[in-house]
Structure formats: C-alpha cells, structure tokens
C-alpha cells in the first residue's frame, strides 16, 4: 500500500499557509479601513473648524454697513471649502456603507464587520452633527441679515412685516427694496446700499443652503435609520438583561426548593433508619 503520509503533511502545510494568508489579508484590510476612518475624522474636524471661522466672518460682515470685499471673499472660500470637504466625506461614508451592505447580503457576520458598522455609524453621526451646526449657522446669519434689512427700511420710513420682507427676499429682485423710498437724503442712500449688500448676502447664502440640502437630508436619514437600529439593539439588550435577572432569580428559587426537598428526603431516610432500628430492637427483645 502506498504511503501517503508525506502527501497529507504537504496538504496540511498548504492549508496552514492559506489560513495565514487570509489572516494577513484581513489584518491589512482592517489597517486600511482604520486609515480611512482617521482620514474621514480629519475631514469632519476640518469642517467643524471652518464652521467656527464662518461664524467669525459673519460677525465681521454684520458689524460693518459696507464690509470689505476681502472678508466676503474669504467667507465664500470657506463655504466652498466646506462644500468640497462635505462631499468627500459623504462619498467615503457611502463607499463604506455599500461595502458593509455587500457583506451583509452574503450573510457574513464577523467581529471586523461589527467594528466597521460601529465606526461608520459614529462617523455618520459626527458628520450630521457638524453639518447641522453649519446649517444652523447659515440660518442664524440669514435671520440677522434680514433683521438689518428691516431696520434699514425703517430708517428710510418704510415699515414692513416679517412676512412682507420674506416675500421681498424671495422675489430675488433688489429693485423692490427701492420702491417707495424717497432718495433725497444721504441717509436713505446709505440705508439702501446696506439693504442691497445684505440682500446679496442672503442670495448667496440660500444658494449654498440649497446645494447642501440634498446631501444633508440623505445623511440625516441614514443616521436616523441607524438610530432606530441602535434603539432596537438597546431594547433587546435591556430585555435580555431582564430575562437573565429573572433566570438568575428563578434559578436561586429552584436551588432553594431543591435544597429543601433534599433536606426533607434526608430527614425521611433518617426517620426510616431510626424506625428500622427501633423495630429491630423490639423484635430482638421479643425473641430474645
């Protein structure tokens, strides 16, 4: 009979090599994944820093009736940078999401997959938080610009309600603000100049908000769905804890009852033994 020991040993060594290769490939994949996570986190931090700088630019522009062009250009550059970086983050998060969905579609489940899902969820939430802050900053700036326009209109003797002013802004026509204003004083001219400046800022702002709206809603819906999933997990965990606690309690009761039953059984055996001794002694006395 042919000795196949060497052949089997070679096959085993080959299998071991395959296992090592798979492990190394998986480790390399996770290393690359964590590098990507750090890159995304860096992008999100950059957006957060830019949002704070945008707030400072807003304050500087509002502090001056006619802000210098340099400040306005710097604000536009910041807004453009936020948009570009946000699109990068969204693209990378989408790529991770698709990779996770593919593995889930193949019914694969591993510690690595759970880690990736957790990291993706954390980054998505952080991204939505910083973009929510940016959106709130833009909305606040719009309201402040709107307030300045309303005050300048009052200076010219024209009173408007908030709804009327909103209609004027939505028209997108700067000339509508000059309607009914008597341009016979430098005060009226200066007021109209600031109105036009603020209106121009609002138009740029609304364009930026529209550009980011779809992306923001897409990510917000993703995070909301993740939140529902996390809530379900927490619910299941809480109920699992309750179940375990009840099981422990029931086990303690069972042990207690079992202990009592065992003691009763021992007492019965002892009584039987004693009774047997008494009967044996009695019979012995009779026949003795």
Curated annotation (Swiss-Prot):
Domain of life: Eukaryota
Gene null: resulting phenotype: Mutant mice show impaired glucose tolerance without any marked hyperglycemia.
Ranges of biased composition (kind: Basic and acidic residues): 1-13
Region annotation Disordered: where it falls in the sequence: 1-20
Transferase as UniProt keyword: no
Ranges for domain t-SNARE coiled-coil homology: 192-254
GO terms for MF: ATP-dependent protein binding; calcium channel inhibitor activity; calcium-dependent protein binding; chloride channel inhibitor activity; identical protein binding; kinase binding; myosin head/neck binding; protein-containing complex binding
Signal peptide start-end: none
Cell compartment(s), UniProt: Cytoplasmic vesicle, Secretory vesicle, Synaptic vesicle membrane; Synapse, Synaptosome; Cell membrane
Residue spans, topological domain Cytoplasmic: 1-265
Pfam families (alphabetical): SNARE, Syntaxin
ATP-binding found in the keyword field: no
Coiled coil: 68-109
Reported modifications of this chain: Phosphorylated by CK2. Phosphorylation at Ser-188 by DAPK1 significantly decreases its interaction with STXBP1. Sumoylated, sumoylation is required for regulation of synaptic vesicle endocytosis.
GO cellular component terms given for this protein: acrosomal vesicle; actomyosin; axon; glutamatergic synapse; membrane; neuron projection; nuclear membrane; plasma membrane
Tissue expression from the record: Expressed in the striatum (at protein level). Expressed in the ileum.
Membrane-spanning parts: 266-286
Biological processes, Gene Ontology terms: calcium-ion regulated exocytosis; hormone secretion; insulin secretion; intracellular protein transport; positive regulation of calcium ion-dependent exocytosis; positive regulation of catecholamine secretion; positive regulation of excitatory postsynaptic potential; positive regulation of neurotransmitter secretion
Gene3D superfamilies in alphabetical order: 1.20.5.110, 1.20.58.70
Subunit structure: Part of the SNARE core complex containing SNAP25, VAMP2 and STX1A; this complex constitutes the basic catalytic machinery of the complex neurotransmitter release apparatus. The SNARE complex interacts with CPLX1. Interacts with STXBP1. The interaction with STXBP1 promotes assembly of the SNARE complex. Interacts (via C-terminus) with KCNB1 (via C-terminus); the interaction increases in a calcium-dependent manner and induces a pore-independent enhancement of exocytosis in neuroendocrine cells, chromaffin cells, pancreatic beta cells and from the soma of dorsal root ganglia (DRG) neurons.
Task of the protein: Plays an essential role in hormone and neurotransmitter calcium-dependent exocytosis and endocytosis. Part of the SNARE (Soluble NSF Attachment Receptor) complex composed of SNAP25, STX1A and VAMP2 which mediates the fusion of synaptic vesicles with the presynaptic plasma membrane. STX1A and SNAP25 are localized on the plasma membrane while VAMP2 resides in synaptic vesicles. The pairing of the three SNAREs from the N-terminal SNARE motifs to the C-terminal anchors leads to the formation of the SNARE complex, which brings membranes into close proximity and results in final fusion.
This protein's name: Syntaxin-1A
Gene encoding the protein: Stx1a
């Amino acid at each position: 009979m042919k000795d196949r020991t060497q052949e089997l040993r070679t096959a085993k060594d080959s299998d071991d090599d395959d296992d090592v290769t798979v492990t190394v490939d998986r480790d390399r994949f996770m290393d690359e994944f964590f590098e990507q996570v750090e890159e995304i986190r860096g992008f999100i931090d950059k957006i957060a820093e830019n949002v704070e700088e945008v707030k400072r630019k807003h304050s500087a522009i509002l502090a001056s009736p006619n802000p210098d062009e340099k400040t306005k250009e710097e604000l536009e550059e910041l807004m453009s940078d936020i948009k570009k970086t946000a699109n990068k983050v969204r693209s990378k998060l989408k790529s991770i999401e698709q990779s996770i969905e593919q593995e889930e579609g193949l019914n694969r489940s591993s510690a690595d997959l759970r880690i990736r899902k957790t990291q993706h969820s954390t980054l998505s939430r952080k991204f939505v938080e910083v973009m929510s802050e940016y959106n709130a900053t833009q909305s606040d700036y719009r309201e402040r610009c709107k307030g300045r326009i309303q005050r300048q209109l009052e200076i010219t003797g024209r009173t408007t309600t908030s709804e009327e002013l909103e209609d004027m802004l939505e028209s997108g026509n700067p000339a509508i603000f000059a309607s009914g204003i008597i341009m016979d004083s430098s005060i009226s001219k200066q007021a109209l100049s600031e109105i036009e400046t603020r209106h121009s800022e609002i138009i740029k702002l609304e364009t930026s908000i529209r550009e980011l709206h779809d992306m923001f809603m897409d990510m917000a819906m993703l995070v909301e769905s993740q939140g529902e999933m996390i809530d379900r997990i927490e619910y299941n965990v809480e109920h699992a804890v309750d179940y375990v606690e009840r099981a422990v309690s029931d086990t303690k009761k069972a042990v207690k009852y079992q202990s009592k039953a065992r003691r009763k059984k021992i007492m019965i055996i002892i009584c039987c033994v004693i009774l047997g001794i008494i009967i044996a002694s009695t019979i012995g006395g009779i026949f003795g």
